[in-house]
Structures are given as structure tokens and as C-alpha cells.
């Protein structure tokens, strides 16, 4: 339920951080500083990692969950970095904090887990510290934490799919975009974002052209997606050939459309409804018990 996404009581808060899904990802250029320019239709689901917060006399961070061993729990973690960022950005309001992250999503998987966690910290502290700072301003400031952090912050604030341009800072809300039933599948191999972009041979692909009216229904959206791309799939496939097997499994389980998200290795399948997605997830997990398989419902109009 939407009301369960972010909960606060007596200074204690928790949030299920957003899963970020690039339904399209067109790489249309590269800046002189090395940052790539993208155009992406991005969907979200509030079924990611669980981040809890409470005020504390000194800073503490606890990392647990099935994928915790694959992350660092020191100053390199985005939860810690996001808290440090907020303390420096708002020194008069800054307070020590206790954060506990239950890591439920695979690491380095192309669905914005770390960025979603950073956005969760920013969102919780903005609320708990009573900051006079708009989501838009905070999103602009947060770009230093990572290109996906601003869009994840927008997702937490506005709970809508987004159209993202530039290096991730140019964000448009898609208020009439439909919700989607999906299945996420990850075969277990981590794919480093830098490695994928390094393997990208062309950096000036054609821009994204999609009729916003097509986003209103599942059928019209699926049809429109056929004319779009994820320009990072081919370089990611060179690093992780198993991606083809994952997409095949999604298609065989009845997906209307399947694609890799972000830089991988997580792939998604779009299904006609929640029941079809759940059945497909059971089928894929039965055939591939070692894979990460998760049925989700995205933000959007029902």
C-alpha cells in the first residue's frame, strides 16, 4: 500500500527504497567531462531495500539482509555518504543518526539499489529535520551522490514514472502513465556500471521518440517500447552472456515485453496483470532456483 512506503512515529522512520527500472535507455551523447547524456523512460516500485532511521547520540549504521555481505558498511556506503552529504549541506539542522539497511536487492544490478537508498536517507532527513528545502532543490544538490539519486528522490516524493534526460538531472513527471505488473530476474553476476560504459562503442545514438499517450495503457506502452532501445545492452552482454538466457526465460514465461534495466544485470518482463506476473515468477524460480526473481507492481495509474 502507498501508505506503507514511508512511516514515521516518535522520531523513528522507515522507508522501502525505490527500485528503478529503465524501460528505455538511449545514450545520445557525452559531455567533455566524461558524463554520458541519456534519455530514459523510468518506472519505479517501492519494494526495494528497507531503510530505517532514528535519532541517536552518535552516528551508527547497521547493514543486514540477504545481500549485505556484498556491500561495504563503512564510509563508502551510499547510506553513510548521503547522511554526511546532508550534514554538510544543512549544518545548522544536522544531527547524529542511526540507520539500519536491510539489503534485499542484488548489488550492482542496474535497478538503482544504492541510489534508492541514498534518496531514502535524503527523504527521511528532509522530513525529520524539518528542512525548508524543496524536493527539486534537494534533487539538484544530490547529483553529486550519483546520477540516479535525483530521479529516485523524485519517485519518493511524487510517486510517478519519470522521463529523464541529460546526466539524470532533467526530470519530467509522467502523471498519466499506467502502472505495470513486472517480474525482475537477476542471474547473480554483478556488472559494474563503469565497465559497461567503457565497452560502449557508440555514444551518439538517436534520441528517444515515444508518444506520451501510449503510456496510458499496458498494450499501447508495450507496442511503443518495440521502437525503443537500451543502448547499454550490447556492451553488457559482452560482460555477462547469461543475460540472453534471462530474457529467454522471461519471454518463455509469458512476458509481453522484456529488456535489461540500466547497465544490468537485472532484466524485467512486463505482464498483462499481477496474477500473470506472480505465476511467471514462480515458474522462473522453479526452473532457476539460484536466480533472484521478484514480481512487482510499479508506480503509475491503475
Swiss-Prot record:
Gene3D superfamilies in alphabetical order: 3.30.230.10, GHMP kinase, C-terminal domain
Keyword Transferase found: yes
Swiss-Prot/TrEMBL keywords: ATP-binding, Isoprene biosynthesis, Kinase, Nucleotide-binding, Transferase
Source superkingdom: Bacteria
InterPro entries xref list: GHMP_kinase_C_dom, GHMP_kinase_C_sf, GHMP_kinase_N_dom, IspE, Ribosomal_Su5_D2-typ_SF, Ribsml_uS5_D2-typ_fold_subgr
Binding of ATP, residues: 106-116
SUPFAM superfamilies reported in the protein's UniProt record: GHMP Kinase, C-terminal domain, Ribosomal protein S5 domain 2-like
Catalytic activity: 4-CDP-2-C-methyl-D-erythritol + ATP = 4-CDP-2-C-methyl-D-erythritol 2-phosphate + ADP + H(+)
TM spans (from-to): none
Catalytic residue positions: 20, 148
GO biological process: isopentenyl diphosphate biosynthetic process, methylerythritol 4-phosphate pathway; terpenoid biosynthetic process
GO molecular function: 4-(cytidine 5'-diphospho)-2-C-methyl-D-erythritol kinase activity; ATP binding
Pathway: Isoprenoid biosynthesis; isopentenyl diphosphate biosynthesis via DXP pathway; isopentenyl diphosphate from 1-deoxy-D-xylulose 5-phosphate: step 3/6
EC number: 2.7.1.148
Short name of any one Pfam family annotated for the protein: GHMP_kinases_C
PANTHER family linked: 4-DIPHOSPHOCYTIDYL-2-C-METHYL-D-ERYTHRITOL KINASE, CHLOROPLASTIC (PTHR43527:SF2)
Similarity section: Belongs to the GHMP kinase family. IspE subfamily.
Described purpose of this protein according to its UniProt entry: Catalyzes the phosphorylation of the position 2 hydroxy group of 4-diphosphocytidyl-2C-methyl-D-erythritol.
Protein name: 4-diphosphocytidyl-2-C-methyl-D-erythritol kinase
Organism: Bartonella quintana (strain Toulouse)
